[in-house]
């Protein structure tokens, strides 16, 4: 249950941001500093719960290497991965239906992995995520009638993290959430390159889905292509976990 509590806690941060934007009429919502502090507190609390749940001897599954003891790196690695993941999912919510569609493909691959290895609770958790996103997508596809805002995207980010950690294999996010990785990396690269070169850009706009949008791709094409790419990543993850000797 700690994963669900974590996702709800992250969603509350998103809700606070949306509330300030909509009700208080402050377009920027929470400041970056406020978001970072709040997210950091929630992430640390979640890591503590995971640490205690592992009997204070944290480990992580790595394909073909088995369960590897993490030691102090559990905290460093965990914080970086979780912080990056929840914000990368948030970045993906930039055009109608994109975040929901990509998260459905994420959920499908994680559901298969969990079911294949008889982790039925995690499989159910992923199934609920798929169902929720599919139901929301009815209203969120282009042209969207309903928007998830930071409340929804942060919750999805929290669930993505929770499911990966429920299988104790956060590294699998590199494949099952490859679009999240690309979106987050494109934003970091754009900002870094902009600062280093004093104004030059790698992409027309970041995150990268906006680059394709400005290159003439329709929103529907972006959603379709990104979802297919993430589904391919998910299929690769299923194969990797099957042949990589996955076991908790």
Where in the sequence are the language-model features?
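Internal, non-catalytic "lid/hinge" segments that mediate substrate recognition, gating
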Residues: 30, 38-57
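Alpha-helical transmembrane segments
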Residues: 1-15, 44-46, 50-53, 71-78, ...
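Membrane-interfacial loop-to-helix junctions in multi-pass inner-membrane proteins
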Residues: 1-4, 23-38
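Membrane-interface helix termini and inter-helical loops of multi-pass transporters
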Residues: 22-23, 54-67, 245-248
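Hydrophobic transmembrane alpha-helix segments characteristic of membrane transport
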Residues: 16-24
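Short, Lys/Arg-rich N-terminal segment immediately upstream of the first membrane anchor
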Residues: 26-29, 66-67, 215-216
């Amino acid at each position: 249950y700690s994963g669900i509590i974590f996702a709800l806690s992250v969603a509350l941060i998103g809700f606070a941001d949306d509330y300030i934007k909509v009700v208080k009429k402050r377009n920027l919502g929470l400041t970056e500093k406020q978001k970072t502090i709040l997210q950091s507190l929630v992430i640390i609390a979640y890591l503590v719960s995971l640490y205690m749940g592992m009997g204070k001897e944290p480990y992580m599954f790595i394909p073909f290497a088995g369960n590897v003891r993490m030691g102090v790196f559990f905290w460093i690695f965990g914080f970086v991965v979780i912080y990056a993941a929840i914000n990368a999912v948030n970045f993906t919510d930039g055009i109608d239906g994109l975040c929901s569609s990509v998260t459905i493909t994420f959920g499908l691959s994680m559901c298969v992995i969990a079911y294949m290895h008889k982790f039925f609770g995690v499989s159910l958790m992923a199934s609920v995520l798929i169902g929720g996103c599919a139901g929301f997508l009815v209203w969120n596809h282009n042209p969207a009638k309903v928007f998830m805002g930071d409340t929804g995207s942060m919750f999805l980010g929290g669930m993505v993290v929770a499911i990966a950690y429920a299988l104790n294999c956060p590294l699998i996010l590199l494949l099952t959430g490859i679009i999240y990785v690309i979106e987050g990396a494109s934003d970091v690269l754009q900002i870094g390159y902009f600062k280093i070169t004093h104004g030059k850009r790698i992409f027309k706009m970041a995150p990268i889905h906006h680059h394709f949008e400005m290159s003439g791709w329709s929103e529907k094409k972006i959603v379709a292509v990104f979802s297919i790419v993430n589904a391919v990543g998910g299929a690769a993850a299923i194969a990797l976990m099957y042949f990589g000797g996955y076991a908790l």
